[in-house]
Each structure stands twice: as structure tokens, then as C-alpha cells.
Amino acid sequence: MVVKALRQISVGQNGVGAFIFPCKKITLQYCNWGGSSQGLRDFLTSKRLAKWAEKYPQIQFEVVAKAGHPVLKAEYINGLNKAICVRNLNVDHVELKLKLLRESSGAQLRHYPKNANVLSLNQSVRGVWSPLHVDPALRHRV
């Protein structure tokens, strides 16, 4: 009997085996002509990007010259993307936004209700409690 192997690509998950950096690619998009891109152009010419690339080899950096306002775009291992407009920001603020994208997990921001302690995809085993489902003889009388 011949055994056939399954052809699947393993999906990287943090906490299973090793730590995987959530951010996999950062694209720096700027305009050569526009004044709003001056901070990002200064960031690129000051060799700070080269230091970032040496410090974080697991992140792929891509520089794109395109008309319009400057944008930093990040791609994450969970398939989501984030984009931050850095128009009219100086070099230090551009680096802060780059750091924000690097440290982010890529997950969408959510509002959690005050008493939602457990998030689950499954229903409760006991069901939802309601005083109307109790036998009327056992209900508390005021």
C-alpha cells in the first residue's frame, strides 16, 4: 500500500515552538516632488532605514516612490494590513510611526464590553440563565 503525503503549508503561530515576529513586511511610500514627504525623504537619506534593516532582518523593507502623501504600510503574519499616513511629519515622528507598526500585532482594534471576561466561539454549556425559566414555585417572592 502506497502512502501519499498531504501537501499543506504550515501556518506560523506564536507560542507553538518558537516566537514568530508578527510584522513581516513594511512598505515606505513617498513622493519625490511633494513637500509633505520631506520627513520621510529625510528619514531615507539619513541612513536610519539601513540601521532598522540591520536590527530587524526578519522584516522585509520596501521603498516605493509614488505620487501622493507618504504612507507606511505593514503586512502581518495573520494576513491583515495596516497603513499610517506620515505627511508633514519630521524624521523622529516617522521613526515613531515605524516603531508603532513594528510592535503592533496586526489585530483589529475591538471594544470589549465591561463584563465580558471570556470570549469563546462555542455556546455556554449551561445555557443562558433567566429568572423566567425557573419553576414559579421556586421563585423568590418579595
Curated annotation (Swiss-Prot):
CC terms in the record's Gene Ontology section: mitochondrial large ribosomal subunit
SMART domains, per database record: L51_S25_CI-B8 (SM00916)
UniProt keyword list: Mitochondrion, Ribonucleoprotein, Ribosomal protein
Pfam families: L51_S25_CI-B8 (PF05047)
SUPFAM superfamilies associated with the record: Thioredoxin-like
Any Gene Ontology biological process: mitochondrial genome maintenance
Transmembrane portions of the chain: none
Statement: the UniProt record of this protein carries the keyword Metal-binding: no
Cell compartment(s), UniProt: Mitochondrion
InterPro entries referenced in this protein's UniProt entry, alphabetically: Ribosomal_mL43 (IPR039927), Ribosomal_mL43/mS25/NADH_DH (IPR007741), Thioredoxin-like_sf (IPR036249)
Gene3D superfamilies: Glutaredoxin
Signal peptide segment: none
Key word Ribonucleoprotein present: yes
Gene Ontology molecular function, alphabetical: structural constituent of ribosome
Subunit structure: Component of the mitochondrial large ribosomal subunit. Mature mitochondrial ribosomes consist of a small (37S) and a large (54S) subunit. The 37S subunit contains at least 33 different proteins and 1 molecule of RNA (15S). The 54S subunit contains at least 45 different proteins and 1 molecule of RNA (21S).
PANTHER family: 39S RIBOSOMAL PROTEIN L43 (PTHR21396), LARGE RIBOSOMAL SUBUNIT PROTEIN ML43 (PTHR21396:SF2)
Family: Belongs to the mitochondrion-specific ribosomal protein mL43 family.
Protein name as it appears in the record: Large ribosomal subunit protein mL43
Source organism of this protein record: Eremothecium gossypii (strain ATCC 10895 / CBS 109.51 / FGSC 9923 / NRRL Y-1056) (Yeast)
Highest classification ranks of the organism: Eukaryota, Fungi, Dikarya, Ascomycota, Saccharomycotina
Gene this protein is translated from: MRPL51
